[in-house]
């Protein structure tokens, strides 16, 4: 039986990892063993942060809506409650966009929410 030499496969595997680690600082981009750990850790961070990104954006939208609603004399929770009672179904992403870029339209939404609460 012929002897199996793994040089080609090992080289390819190492090249693949070192290519992924390109741009990392110091040994993390040059030494296979260190680069492998760095790439694994980067993958874990990426996986975790793809989920956190969704939470962080929602927090940002809520903070923006809250600030704009308070300028118009209503808290965030009362504003959202008023919109629900007025059966206005606009998601937080769009509300935050309106709050930042179209203050007049947001003011109108606040007035409708106030009317529904009264």
Curated annotation (Swiss-Prot):
Pfam families xrefs: Ribosomal_L20
Biological process annotations from GO: ribosomal large subunit assembly; translation
GO CC entries: ribonucleoprotein complex; ribosome
GO molecular function: rRNA binding; structural constituent of ribosome
Stored InterPro entries: Ribosomal_bL20 (IPR005813), RIBOSOMAL_L20_CS (IPR049946), Ribosomal_protein_bL20_C (IPR035566)
Domain of life: Bacteria
Keywords on record: Ribonucleoprotein, Ribosomal protein, RNA-binding, rRNA-binding
Function: Binds directly to 23S ribosomal RNA and is necessary for the in vitro assembly process of the 50S ribosomal subunit. It is not involved in the protein synthesizing functions of that subunit.
Similarity-based family: Belongs to the bacterial ribosomal protein bL20 family.
Protein name (record): Large ribosomal subunit protein bL20
Native species: Serratia proteamaculans (strain 568)
Top-level taxonomy: Bacteria, Pseudomonadati, Pseudomonadota, Gammaproteobacteria, Enterobacterales
Gene field: rplT
């Amino acid at each position: 039986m012929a002897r199996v030499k793994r040089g080609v496969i090992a080289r390819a595997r190492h090249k693949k990892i070192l290519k992924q680690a390109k741009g990392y600082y110091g040994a993390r981009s040059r030494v296979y063993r260190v680069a492998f750990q760095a790439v694994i850790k980067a993958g874990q961070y990426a996986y975790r942060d793809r989920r956190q990104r969704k939470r962080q954006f929602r927090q940002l939208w809520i903070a923006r809506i809250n600030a704009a609603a308070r300028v118009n004399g209503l808290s965030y929770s009362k504003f959202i409650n008023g919109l629900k009672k007025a059966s206005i179904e606009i998601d937080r992403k769009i509300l935050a966009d309106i709050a930042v870029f179209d203050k007049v339209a947001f003011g109108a939404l606040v007035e409708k929410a106030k009317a529904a609460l009264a």
